[in-house]
């Protein structure tokens, strides 16, 4: 689903009127969410659980953060596993993702990316997935999303916020992009990670309530160098496709076509062939995101370039202090105690 423009429209424009008309529905959504969160007794996993979540519908940059945390924890001696719902995949789980065997249509796109870096599991039932991962030897679990899922207790919840988008118009679905009121979410989290320039005053809103970590998404240097000056046809089916388009322009690429698709869009062979034909007609290189790449038909995937990104932390020491209690209690088998 594409986010309605009024979700991120500034005050004083005509579009917020539609948001106001949807306020009763937003109040009903909020009440239902609060009942669901308060009415469920969470299951406590036998290993620490770190949740990387957000408060808005759509993309915020969680997957690169999960990948970074998995790497940090594993470097610290913990057998860190990823756990995802497997959004967009048809298999309910719990099961461990095998990139050589599973497809995005089966397990979702994010789990395939995570499985390339660490053991990754999918499960519609997060508690069942956590049990399976712990039984398989996981020393700590990193949840990709799941902040609003009350079925499993979290030891550390990190809310990721896109600095460009912030919390949008500050209203709850369908009047705005929020999955729950900001105050409710901040009350259950331990820290906020603000990605990119703070264009919406998010840091001021969170200051005094939670630590605010800062970071930015950085393209792979070699990939960036290869794209400088190249004619590019850019396409993406992520929460905010325009982020890819702006990044490519900032790298010096000549973006001659920008093609947004719905989040988690399952590209068909016919669609991709049409994109490749259009790129050829424009004498352009087809470029997409890593998340989109794993959803492309395997037989045509090699004709598309992906732009890998990673997170650069402004104050990694603050993150290390948040993770320290998990790292300090590990046993000889990488289990956190």
Swiss-Prot record:
Pathway: Glycolipid biosynthesis; lipid IV(A) biosynthesis; lipid IV(A) from (3R)-3-hydroxytetradecanoyl-[acyl-carrier-protein] and UDP-N-acetyl-alpha-D-glucosamine: step 6/6. The keyword Cell cycle does not apply. Its EC number is 2.7.1.130. It is an enzyme of class 2 (transferase). SUPFAM superfamilies: P-loop containing nucleoside triphosphate hydrolases. One of its GO terms (cellular component) is plasma membrane. ATP binds at residues 56-63. Pfam families: LpxK. Transfers the gamma-phosphate of ATP to the 4'-position of a tetraacyldisaccharide 1-phosphate intermediate (termed DS-1-P) to form tetraacyldisaccharide 1,4'-bis-phosphate (lipid IVA). Belongs to the LpxK family. This is Tetraacyldisaccharide 4'-kinase.
